[in-house]
Regions:
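Extracellular glycoside hydrolase catalytic/binding regions
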Residues: 26, 50, 54-71, 76, ...
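Conserved small/polar residues in nucleotide/adenosyl-binding loops
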Residues: 176-181
Length: 182
């Protein structure tokens, strides 16, 4: 898959090597532009993996395309060498949620996927989060606001997040993850 050129060489995104090179270029470019801003109250502390899955052989779909096990570790190593973190927010039980630390990700916050549908088991979610050293993403949107249709349902689900996080000790883990980079 042709992407463009980098340092005079045509990049082929079907290879992990070229994708890693492009990611490194992107990181360097973002840092360069950020440094030009001379921001007084903002720090660039890390980078975020947009994919909600980290696909490895036998875990997730289309490993041949995604190759997370080949791409994420060298990218994490590069980021760590320049004092940047690698962050990830998988959906509930996404591919890689048990392997994120092995791949070099620094902070991972799993989504409960409960706020909108309320059908998944929060008990299983909290068990998975604790067993795998994950933080929790507290999902919500404008539906929680007073005056929105069914806001009482969404408020109840959000309260269930908060109560479950406190009960299972997940609230402290998520907070500690955030404080670690200050």
């Amino acid at each position: 898959v042709y992407w463009g050129e980098l340092n005079g060489r045509k990049m082929d995104f079907s290879t992990a090597e070229d994708r890693i090179a492009a990611y490194k270029w992107y990181v360097d470019e973002v840092r360069r532009r950020f440094d030009l801003g001379n921001y007084q109250y903002i720090d660039l502390a890390g980078f975020y993996i947009i994919s909600e899955e980290l696909v490895t052989p036998g875990d997730g779909w289309n490993h041949e395309l995604k190759k997370s096990d080949e791409i994420i570790p060298p990218l994490a190593e590069y980021l760590h060498a320049i004092n940047q973190s690698l962050n990830w927010i998988p959906y509930n039980r996404a591919a890689g949620y048990k392997k994120w630390q092995q791949l070099g990700v620094d902070y991972a916050y799993m989504q409960p996927n409960y706020f909108w549908e309320g059908q998944k088991s929060l008990s299983q979610f909290f068990s998975d989060v604790k067993a795998n050293g994950l933080g929790m993403e507290f999902e919500f949107d404008e539906n929680i606001l007073e005056g929105e249709q069914n806001s009482d349902v969404y408020k109840k689900r959000f309260r269930e997040y908060m109560e479950g996080a406190k009960k299972h000790g997940v609230y402290a883990v998520s907070y500690t993850h955030l404080r670690a980079h200050e």
